[in-house]
Structures are given as C-alpha cells and as structure tokens.
Amino acid sequence: MGDPLERLGSQASMATESVMKEDLCLEIDPPLTESVATAEDWRRALGKVVPAVVVLRTTACRAFDTESAGASYATGFIVDKRRGIILTNRHVVKPGPVVAEAMFVNREEIPIYPVYRDPVHDFGFFCYDPSAVQFLTYQEIPLAPEAASVGLEIRVVGNDSGEKVSILAGTLARLDRDAPHYKKDGYNDFNTFYMQAASGTKGGSSGSPVIDWQGRAVALNAGSKSSSASAFFLPLQRVVRALSFLQKSIDSRTDKPKAVHIPRGTLQMTFLHKGFDEIRRLGLRSETEQVVRHASPTGETGMLVVDSVVPSGPADKHLEPGDVLVRVNGTVLTQFLNLENLLDDGVGQILELEIERGGQPLSVSVSVQDLHSITPDHFLEVSGAVIHPLSYQQARNFRFPCGLAYVADPGYMLFRAGVPRHAIIKKVANEDISSLGDLVSVLSKLSRGARVPLEYMSHTDRHRKKSVLVTIDHHEWYAPPQLYTRNDSSGLWDAKPAIEPASVSPSIGNNGFPISQDISLCHHDTEPMHEVNVRGVTDIAAIMETSSGDGSQNDFGSEAKKQRVDEDSSDGIAANGSLYGSEFKSDDAMETDTTVLRDFEGATALSANASLAERAIEPALVMFEVHVPPSCSLDGVHSQHFFGTGIIIYHSSNMGLAVVDKNTVAISASDVMLSFAAFPVEIPGEVVFLHPVHNYALIAYNPSAMDPASASVIRAAELLPEPALQRGDSVYLVGLSRNLQATSRKSIVTNPCAALNIGSADSPRYRATNMEVIELDTDFGSSFSGALTDEQGRIRAIWGSFSTQVKYSSTSSEDHQFVRGIPVYAISQVLEKIITGGNGPALLINGVKRPMPLVRILEVELYPTLLSKARSFGLSDEWIQVLVKKDPVRRQVLRVKGCLAGSKAENLLEQGDMVLAVNKMPVTCFNDIEAACQTLDKGSYSDENLNLTILRQGQELELVVGTDKRDGNGTTRVINWCGCVVQDPHPAVRALGFLPEEGHGVYVTRWCHGSPAHRYGLYALQWIVEVNGKKTPDLNAFADATKELEHGQFVRIRTVHLNGKPRVLTLKQDLHYWPTWELRFDPETALWRRNILKALQ
C-alpha cells in the first residue's frame, strides 16, 4: 500500500494549462549526464543524507477534513537532530488524528508525533525523542531554499514504491510552476509556486528531500503526474520560517511541553500567477504593465490574478475572480512569497489592495484573518460519524463559508439516513445548524430511538437542500457522542463526552410523540444515552472489511436488494416523514379516524384488477427496510442495507410477528423498520428468531406503538401448511411493489420439492442448506418477494429471496440472489411455540418475557442423489426398491456433503455417506431427517441421538449420531480489539468443516480502517488462537487475555486462516483511539449493550 494522495490518478484538465488533475506519486528516471558535480561529490553527499532519511508509517485513526481513515507509508527527513524534528508533507502528517512511527536505515523504529501541519502548504513536522535512536550515527539535513535554480542537478532520496531507500536523479526544469491540483474534494496546495523536474517519483516518496551535490535540501518532494515523468517539489522558504518558530518554541519549554504557534494569515482567496499576455486580455492597462515591469525583479513575466474567493471570508464582496493585483500597501507585488510574508506578519491588520478589474483601477481595504482560526482542531464523533467545522481547504473546494457543520465520515446514523460524505448539515429537528456547537446542542435534546428530520446540502448539488429522517441509535452500537480536541503538546487528540447523560431528554415515539410510561416497550426508551462505539467503520463504508485481501465491503451485494434504497435514499425517506401526522392521535378524533380509515379500505377494495387473494392478503403485507451497523457486521453479512417483503403471521394488542427471508434480515444485530401495506405507518421491529437452517426470520413489532386506527386495520395472514403443494397446483404470487402497492399474479407450481445447492461464498455467510423449495412457471423477477396463497388468500408458502455468489474465476465473483417458495410448515411450528411458550431461554418482547423455542437439528449438510446414480456407488437393489416405495416422486437418496465443525456428528459421518434410514425408517428427503429430530423432543426420555443406517463405500453401517439444539438468536456477542471485530465461529464458517487444532479460536469477521489491525495486517477470515502465548479457544478466554495488555504494548498474535495456514504477527495496541469493548445482546432488556473491557484511565 502507498500514500493515499500519491496513488491518485491524473484527471482531465478543467482549463488548458493551469488547472490540471495530477496524481501524487513518485517517479523513477535514469540519471542525467553531464553533471557539474563529480560522482565522488554525490557519494559524499548521499553518505550524509541517507542516514537522515526515514520511512514514515502513518495511521490516520479517523477520517478528518480532506483525508480518510487508513494506513500508509511515506518519507521524511531529519532537519533538527538535537530537537528531534522531522520534515515531511502535510498530507503525510494529516490534519486529523494520526499515529506514526519512523524507521531509520538501520531498521531502528521509534514513535513520532505530529507537532505542526500547515493549513495550506504541503508540509508538516513530526517530533521524536533523539535519545530513542541508539545505534545509528546520522546528521541533520540543512535546508537551502536559495540554492534552487533552473538546471540544478538534484537527487530525490526516499521510500519510493516502498523500497525503503531509493535515489532518483533529475534536473530542476521550472521554479514557477502552478501548484498541482489533486482532487476536487480533497487536499490541494495553492498560493505558491512549485518546482518541476523529470525524476519519475511514485508512491511512498512523499516527503523526500530534494538535495543538491552538497547534501542540502533545496525542495520537498510532494507529488507527481502519473501520465508523465514530472515530479513536483514544494519550495522551502515557508518551511524555513515555520521551522524557526518550532525550534524557538521547543527551546522555550521548561518541564512541560507546549503547543507551538506559527502565525499564519489569510484573506480566504486564491491567486494564480498569470503571464502578461493573458493579463492584457483581462483588461490590464498598458501604463500599469509598464509600472509593474519596471518595479519588479528582472525576468518577471506576470502578475497575481484572483482565481476564487471563499464566501463570507475577508475578501468576499471586495474582490472577484479576474481581479489583477497591482499593489499591496502601496508596493507593487507580483510574487506569492512576498504576499504571504505580508499576510503572515499582519494577522489582524488591514491591507490596502490596489487592483484592476476589467481595466478599471480600484482600491480595497481587507482585514487579514488568522488562518488557524478557520482550521478545525476538534471534531464530534457520533454513531461512527465524524463531523467538524468546515475547513478552509474544503470551503475553497466547495465554495461554502468556513465553520459549517461538515460530515467527514457519515458513519452509521447518517449513512442510514442517506447523508453522504462531504455533506453540510443545515438543520436537525427543525433547528438551524450553523456550527458544530449548534449540532451538539440539538443532539443533547434527543434520546435513543428518536426520529427527527435533518436537512443538508452537498457540493455536488449545492442549489438544492435535501431532507431526510435521522434515527438516533436505539441500541448501543457505538459509544456515546465524543468530542475530540487536538493537543499539539502531546500530538494526540483528547476525547471527552460531548453530551452529559443528565441532559438526555425522554424518548420520542415512532410517531414523533412522547411515549407514555405505561406502555410495556418503554423500558428502554426512557433510559439515558448509553455508549455507542468509538469508531465506525469507514466504510462503509465505511466502510469495514470482511475479506483477507483488501477486504472491501463497500459493495452492497445484490443489486436488486439495494436498487430501491439507492433511488429513494433521500426523497423517499423524507416523504415517509409526512406519514406521522397528528390526525390519528387522540381519542377525540376517533370518528374522523374511522372515516379516513373507511375511505382507505374502500380505495383498496375497489382496485380494478385486484384478485380475491390479493385483497385478502394485502392487510398482512409489510415492507422491511433493514440496516446493519458497520460495528456489527457479523456472520459474514455482505451488505449494510437490505429490503424485502414480509408477511404478518400474528397480530394482537400486545405483540405482532412478521416473517421474512434471511436475505432481508440476515443477522439479529440489525435495525429493522416495517412499513405496512394496510395503513401508511412505519414503526421499528426487533429480530426475535433466526432459524438456524431454514431461510426465514421472525420479527416482532409493538402494535401499541401505533394509533388505534392503524392497528385495527392490520391483519395476520392465515397459514395453511397442509396439504403440501403438488406439481400443477395453481397459486397466487402476492407481494409489494416499491410504492407499497399489492401486486399479484396466478402461477403454476412446476416443482414443489426442488433441493437447494448453494455454494460457499468467498467470505462465509449464511446460505440455505438442507431445504426443499417451490418453483413456479412464472414470477416477477429475482427482486420480488412475498407469499404464495390459495384463492382465499391463505399462505401456502413464503416467496423468499436467497443469496448466492457466482464465481467467474478464482479471483472474480459477484453476489446474486434468486427467489423460491419456502413451505410454511416449519414457520407454523415455531410460531406456535412462541405464542404458547417454547422450551428455550426467555426473551423480552414488547415488555413481556416469552420462552423461545429451541430447534433440534442434525448439523450435517446433505444433498440428494438420484437412485440411478446411487446404484453406481454401490446402493443395493433392495434399498432402491425400499426408497422408491417410500417416495415414488423424488426417487433419490440423501448423501453427506460435510459435517459442521464442532458438531456431535463430526468424526462420525463422512463425506459421501448415503443416509438410508433413521431409527429403522427409510428417509428420502430433508423433511424426514427434520421430523426424526423433532420426535426426540416429543419423547418422554431425553434421547439426543439418532440411529442412522448409512452406506459407506459399499458397506452398510449402523451409527448412533448425536443431534444439536440451537436457538434462534444468532450471534449475540462480539468483541472489538485493536479495531478487529471477533466473534465465535458462526455456522457458515463451521460448515467448511474446519476449526483450528489449537482450539476453536475466535474468528475475525472484519476490521476497521485506521486501526492497529489495519496497520499491522490482522485481516478478516482467520482465527486468533493465541495472544502472547495464551490460548484463546473462545471469547471469554480472548477477553481475559486482552485485558492484561497495556497501551502501546506490542502483542504477539497466532492466527490460522480459513485455508488452514498458520501465521504469527505482532501489532501495537492503541487504547487511546481503539479501546477494547464488547457488544452483547441482553435478553432481559432486548437491547444490545456495549461494555468497555480495556481503555486508558
């Protein structure tokens, strides 16, 4: 990996010469000949320089301003040995939180911390403890900006392309090049000249010294153009000034470090240096040109022209693009350096500018602003989002005023609402937001679960504001809001709570009204804000990773699953806000409610083309929208956003249950919203049951959270598990369109018992196994889900979505989905146990504890084989006749594909075994195995074993195989350590048939950008089996092992990859930015709770 800025590709030019999109990377060119210096001179110079050049390994712990969270490498060099000062680029030092180490040529590695990053120009300083370098003799590299001249032969000494030490040759060709333009929405230097040479630098050489034959640094390498061999170097005049301030600040310290202050002034405007020929075309008068040429140094070829002005800045309303600068305070000025001297030394003073605008001379007075006052030094972290005042850099890019509430990373809460990165927040809960303090004040009035409107602007569509609904996290997915402030004396960003718990107000209900305290679900709504994770995942985007390579999880899996979300992410969500009116609230309005309700029902019933089945089932249809927090991307879930149609199967005054496929609700750690077809209302739901085998989940909602009008019109569908569908039967496929309109068609069952065979994904996730599904002759496509009903609207099957991964090659794959019918017999059995009381642990549902069912399963993956094929594998004619008599339709036998690792069947059954009978009863389908397991629970004795008759390599065997009981909770505990998310191996991982020999270990399911796990390569898809020699067979052992680790300690980790390859790596724990915490589902409160396991005191 390389420096992020150095890996940017060049882009098309916006103008003919000056505004080109260059790429920050480092280049290699053959050395030029005819050098004025001898080879011995260069050897001596390089002998001094190379030991003073260091490789910088930086980790941006949070997204901030123009930078994203991540790890990179670059170059720096020692400019003050006694004080321990390293010079490098600003985009290496980073404007936000950063952790860095410097490695010398002798492989000594020392910690360094940032002390200054220039707000505009591409340079910054790290500091280190000189006494930490024990085994290397080195000298500082002197800075000589005056030595730079056209034709000077130079060497660039740096970490080119990660090669530790590289020496690239070149010749300075220009000293007055325009500052390179890297990105429209990222960091760019301006108001300075750059130097140019054909030295061919690439990624990793940012911050390298550009030296002459005497070993002096004449410039600082900053970037390059990827389409050519041109490298761009920053002049050092302003670097020398900043260094002198930094040295004086260090010398003035007593016993306690203090932050350095380097005066910097600004007018919040950008100048370009244009030639006299172009300035004449702008209307420059001839007499003015004569005066300027006469007063300027010999060889001056142009003047400074205003390129852009930041709104609400000191120059706004005074200067305009195209204005030509003639004099400042009565002196002719044509160079950036002279202007910057006046600005930096005149903070708070008034400058008199003489300009020409279209040939008309004008004079303006402008106040010089402190540049540091518009450079953000703090940010708010809430629900994984990073929000801070809009910086001068981005204000210049986007043409917004400085200081607005800027989204550097949307995290989870804002991403869920559709707020993008780089957005400007204008309103929250109908209150204006003009600064970060306003946002904190509004958030302090909101509580968990509150849904409020948010208004934002984007630079890509700056003339229109967008409104969305933001939901404050109901569960403790992340830490409470934290306010981070930069501390230049320590190099760290210090965190403190942004909101005091006492300031949290009562919860707001789903309809926008306070929930009364007598409603059973309110036990969690009235609690103060709890912790909600220190860092989101970027990536989403943030996004976080689930593969062992780059681990990108930005792809949302199925295109169909995300299509509606992409198209409706703003306007659709905003429209939902209008559904929460007050007209259906009070008892006094019941008569009006009934009238409105009657009209709504009439409109539905009078639908011209609606079938009887469609009208009967429509009150039971519900649309699910599901969001998965990046901090809880468990069990290999392949997206953060899902939607699909579900069916209400139970509805009473105190509990409602809806069923939906597991490609919509994949894991229990999710935020679920339900929109009902029967009435325009949207309420949250909670995952209460995930079937361990079958592709369905049960979601509970609280009918008392609705008003009586909406609750009364909703109906539960009638399930009809018997008789089973047969080939040729007519059914109605009913579901919801994107606008929540019921849609149906009549179809014919072509195969009522099609066996599924879904392969494993690259990143193991749930896949339906041991299931028979229903196939139809026609449907509505792979993105339409719903139900199969008879003519009366009774549910015969769920028409659900299944996730699969299509692999085109060993390195290329794509997520897809398909839809099939899921018989309702298994659903009806679980539903009955939930209503009457199951045999498992209790779960709090809408304030009432209900015993949940346990499901007994044989943890073996099976697949059917035709009897004609089975005969070739040694199946006898007698058994063939028995199986045909048992099931003349299927004419198949079940074979073992594999056993789940850690199951009771492991080491008993082998791949390829044919299962002929269970308890002496022939079996031909998955239902036979499932029925045998259920029979064990009905017996009067507690027998957990099945007597299997199998055929193995032509030999008939009798085996006693144990079964396993599983609940429907899914994964309920996860630990975040050093930015990697670990959990117990989930069934999809165990289905691979492998667990480490060193004990099962804890499974790394994902990692976070900018974390120690990212920095040291502790990626996903592997088990951690040892921490500092201590075995970690489960999460309890892992938690105990990590609690003993201290901040800054190097930790030795032993891992085993999914392919069985062991590995040992080390990483450095960082408890300041990445404390160790766990997230655990609490069945007593039905909440996900976040607990800190280890953090700095």
UniProtKB/Swiss-Prot annotation:
Protein name listed in UniProt: Protease Do-like 7
Organism in which the protein naturally occurs: Arabidopsis thaliana (Mouse-ear cress)
Biased composition (Basic and acidic residues): 558-567
Keyword Cytoplasm: yes
Keywords from the named record: Cytoplasm, Hydrolase, Protease, Serine protease
Family from the record: Belongs to the peptidase S1C family.
Residue ranges of every copy of the PDZ domain listed in the record: 269-366
One GO term describing the cellular component: chloroplast
Compartments reported by the entry: Cytoplasm
GO molecular function: peptidase activity; serine-type endopeptidase activity
Residue numbers annotated as active site: H524, S785
The protein's Enzyme Commission number: 3.4.21.-
